[in-house]
């Protein structure tokens, strides 16, 4: 490791520990030439995830953009900002574990809805109304009816917007359409 003070390439590791919840390694080093001490971090380099939007455009996955959308949906619901950050981190981890580097915005929306459904029904409805591009009150009523039915029959069911075009591959195995 190159010393930031004298640019010498030899250093010794004084201390090494896990950091950032096991996501990186923090190393305390000492330059063998100038004796200055410095800290380095070793992190996993993730391959970027590309999001395919509704209109077909592609953009890099931005966790902060997802978090902002969730914060808006969860205002005044009692879900803490830290909980939303944890959900976004979980979603990002799930996406990183996939072999495919492209994901549709619909798939991301489904993941968010799955988490919000467990946390708060109001947040779920708010997010679904934007994600599903609700056109009117009928869309809200249909989604509320679906929530009531799911409460009677517990399942892993996820709401699917009526105007969405999932291919067979992309459709979660237990998707319900609003009636």
Swiss-Prot record:
Cofactor: Zn(2+)
Alphabetic keyword roster: ATP-binding, DNA-binding, Metal-binding, Nucleotide-binding, Repressor, Transcription, Transcription regulation, Zinc, Zinc-finger
Region described as Disordered: 160-179
ZnF (unnamed) intervals: 3-34
Annotated ranges, domain ATP-cone: 49-139
Similarity section: Belongs to the NrdR family.
HAMAP family: NrdR
Name of the protein described by the UniProt record: Transcriptional repressor NrdR
Lineage of the organism: Bacteria, Bacillati, Cyanobacteriota, Cyanophyceae, Oscillatoriophycideae
């Amino acid at each position: 490791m190159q010393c930031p003070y004298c640019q010498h390439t030899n250093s010794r590791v004084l201390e090494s520990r896990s950091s950032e919840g096991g996501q990186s390694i923090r190393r305390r080093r000492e330059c063998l030439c100038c004796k200055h001490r410095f800290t380095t971090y070793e992190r996993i380099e993730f391959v970027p995830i590309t999001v395919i939007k509704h209109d077909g455009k592609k953009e890099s996955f931005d966790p902060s953009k997802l978090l902002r959308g969730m914060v808006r949906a969860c205002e005044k619901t009692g879900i803490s900002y830290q909980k939303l950050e944890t959900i976004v981190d979980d979603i990002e981890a799930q996406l990183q574990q996939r072999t495919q580097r492209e994901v549709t915005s619909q798939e991301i929306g489904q993941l968010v809805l799955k988490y919000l459904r467990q946390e708060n029904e109001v947040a779920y409805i708010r997010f679904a109304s934007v994600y599903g591009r609700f056109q009117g009150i009928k869309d809200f009523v249909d989604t509320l009816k679906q929530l009531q039915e799911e409460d009677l029959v517990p399942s892993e069911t996820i709401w699917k917007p009526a105007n969405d075009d999932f291919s067979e591959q992309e459709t979660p195995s237990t998707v319900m359409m609003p009636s």
